[in-house]
Amino acid sequence: MEKLARRLDLCQEQLLELYEQDSKQLQHHILHWKYIRYESVIYYTARQMGIKRLGHQVVPSLDVSKAKAHAAIEMQMCLESLQTTEYNLEPWTLQDTSQELWLAEPKKCFKKGGKTVEVRFDCNEHNAMHYTLWTAVYVQVEDTWTKVEGQVDHRGLFYTVHGCTTYYVDFGKEAHTYGKTNDWTVIVGSRVICSPSTVEGLPIVAPVDIRHPAATDATDATKVHDAPYALPASTTKVYNDSHAPPRKRRRDGDLSISAVDGCSGRKYVDTGNRARSPDIESNNKIRNSGGGHSTPIIQLEGDANCLKCFRYRLTKVSHLYTNSSTTWRWTTESRTNKNAIITLTYSSVHQRSQFLALVKIPKTIKHSLGMLTIM
């Protein structure tokens, strides 16, 4: 028993010296795991002999000592293999060679230079998870080691070795766990990467009169939008000049946005995608008689990053709209409202109807229809 206690003390003294040394050399970290293995073997032997204490140290169970010894052997052998490569000359910290980092994703690889990747599920900043993107991943291929760069895209975190790509974090699977929709936004520093779900919802159609394999869904959606587009009475209002209060005379070039009243924030929803009533037709005649030109628009409102991602996806179906604005906000809005706005313009009401029929707008983005009039 005393002999085992002396060996344990000697082993632990060597470990303390290595911790205090805080070396950056791989050979010292190999020694660290060698002494961890010795310590576990001493504990295992003592437990087999029925000894439960060695000095002031409590002897772990056989299973614990055995598992720790196996882990130490694995780490020592992998580090010795890594030492035979050119990566031996790189600085290595105790943390770089720890078992916790060895078993972190991607598992069974050495990793350095972690960066935080934020993933917002449902495009909600309050429903975000953080993952680690490694700038250097050391992968063992047969008897040698290869250093590759960790990468990120809309699908997840991955690395590529000899043309073979391995994803160690799949954002799609994570979205099923943490999200309610199949939308997510990836933020890496100043970069914003969007999920592919809504891209799939934006069919890159040929001219609309050509039948497409997905035409069944598009036809159904068209039927829905061809029907009267009803909104709650509190938010739906057709603008009629004959009932409006007198306005100041506009100069040429002034803008009148009938979709939104800038003073009150009330929204006026255009009904151009349905059969128009005589009042609306006469109203348009009044506008046109004054030399004005009305452009159908859709106003999108939501999280700024989510809107930017959606606008980027829309470039795949740019034939379904005319122009897209940058993100903007009302200056009179409450500071607590962090939503941004994007305005899309269309050459005709028919083009806007096609857009609504073929494009899936995420549930996290509100949209309103309207007319932009230039007098």
From Swiss-Prot:
Residues 1-200 are annotated as: Transactivation domain. It is found in: Host nucleus. Phosphorylated. GO terms for cellular component: host cell nucleus. SUPFAM superfamilies: E2 regulatory, transactivation domain, Viral DNA-binding domain. Coiled coil: none annotated. Residues 235-293 are annotated as: Disordered. InterPro entries: E2/EBNA1_C_sf, Nucleotide-bd_a/b_plait_sf, Papillomavirus_E2_C, PPV_E2_N, Reg_prot_E2, Regulatory_protein_E2_N, Regulatory_protein_E2_N_1, Regulatory_protein_E2_N_2. Its main location: host cell. Belongs to the papillomaviridae E2 protein family. Binds DNA as homodimer. Interacts with protein E1; this interaction greatly increases E1 DNA-binding activity. Interacts with protein L1; this interaction enhances E2-dependent replication and transcription activation. Interacts with protein L2; this interaction inhibits E2 transcriptional activity but not DNA replication function E2. Interacts with protein E7; this interaction inhibits E7 oncogenic activity. Interacts with host TAF1; this interaction modulates E2-dependent transcriptional regulation. Interacts with host BRD4; this interaction mediates E2 transcriptional activation function. This is Regulatory protein E2. It comes from Human papillomavirus 7.
